[in-house]
Amino acid sequence: MTNYLYLAIAIAAEVVATTSLKAVAGFSKPLPLLLVVGGYVLAFSMLVLVMRTLPVGVVYAIWSGLGIVLVSLVAMFVYGQRLDPAALLGIGLIIAGVLVIQLFSRASGH
């Protein structure tokens, strides 16, 4: 269970870092830059811990898939990005893929 907590922290940190990239404004704003650097350092640090016991393919699929979904949603609410039907379908397919991996994959740790 601890590994999934670390994975959740990694995903959240990556989402904060990625969505803060837009606010950096050409490196002219230091606080968003700190969020970017700190977020990525935290995200990858947590991924290192998670990958000690969980399969790399499963971890990366969950991390990247949920990261894409959450970054898209944050961009929609914070930056006013519009998601067209194709984007919403894609997000739905990503969520479905993560669920399939979580519920039905027999991948084991190394």
UniProtKB/Swiss-Prot annotation:
Q: Name one GO molecular function term.
A: amino-acid betaine transmembrane transporter activity
Q: How does it sit in the membrane?
A: Multi-pass membrane protein
**A GO term (biological process) for this protein?**
glycine betaine transport
What are the GO cellular component annotations? Answer: plasma membrane
User: According to its UniProt record, which protein family does this protein belong to?
Assistant: Belongs to the drug/metabolite transporter (DMT) superfamily. Small multidrug resistance (SMR) (TC 2.A.7.1) family.
Recorded protein name is Multidrug transporter PA4990
Task: Give disulfide pairs as residue numbers.
Answer: none
Transmembrane parts of this sequence = 7-27, 31-51, 58-78, 85-105
Give the InterPro entries listed for this entry: Small_drug/metabolite_transptr, Small_multidrug_res
Q: Which domain of life is it from?
A: Bacteria
Alphabetical list of Pfam families matching this protein: Multi_Drug_Res
- List UniProt keywords, sorted A-Z: Antiport, Cell membrane, Membrane, Transmembrane, Transmembrane helix, Transport
